[in-house]
Design a protein with these regions (language model features):
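SAM-dependent nucleic-acid methyltransferase catalytic core
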Residues: 1-68, 79-92
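Glycine-rich S-adenosyl-L-methionine
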Residues: 72-111
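Conserved Class I SAM-dependent methyltransferase catalytic core
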Residues: 96-149
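Class I S-adenosyl-L-methionine
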Residues: 130-175
């Protein structure tokens, strides 16, 4: 896989047999206060403020909870027992991964964000189209767009894609 862990493998690839090595993270000491949150972004946005808000939400219907369940288990440091066909733990489904709800999630977040600058990273294959994002951003301030073309990452040689590249967008809002 491409550094995601969506389920237990029926047959192990060579790369899956390597030991997982966890090394301590080194953090730079600073006089500044750092805070980490683990809650719904649209609830949290009503409690925080700042100069710059950088957003990098899921682009598609693939849930982060499923793709990164091993990392979540490591972070939780609990006695999880895999169950079911995939072995995944229960996780909260995100409205950012639902086509019918994602535009409202973004609109609510932008409307309630008490930040001067908002940057949103999103690609051309996401659930939201370029014009949808532009329309939402333009309702709240001055909008700019930057883009960068990237060669598509192919997780395995058997996959076929219509496109060999993707475009990453940086949507910029000055509120």
């Amino acid at each position: 896989t491409a550094s995601v862990y969506g389920a237990f493998l029926k047959t192990l690839k060579k790369s899956a047999t390597k030991p997982i090595v966890l090394e301590p993270a080194f953090f730079e000491y600073s006089k500044n206060q750092h805070v980490v949150f683990n809650e719904d972004s649209n609830q949290l946005i009503q409690e925080v403020e700042g100069d710059i808000l950088y957003l990098d939400p899921p682009y598609n219907a693939r849930e982060y909870g499923a793709n990164y369940h091993i990392l979540n288990t490591i972070a939780l440091y609990d006695d999880f027992t895999p169950r079911g066909k995939t072995g995944l733990r229960e996780y909260e489904k995100s409205n950012w991964c639902k086509k019918a709800k994602v535009a409202n999630e973004l609109e609510t977040l932008i409307r309630n964000a008490n930040f001067e600058w908002i940057f949103l990273s999103y690609n051309n294959e996401g659930l939201l189209g370029l014009e949808q994002i532009r329309a939402i951003f333009e309702r709240y301030g001055i909008y700019q767009l930057k883009s960068q073309k990237y060669q598509r990452f192919k997780a395995d040689s058997n996959r076929t894609h219509k496109q060999d590249s993707t475009i990453e967008y940086l949507h910029i809002l000055h509120k």
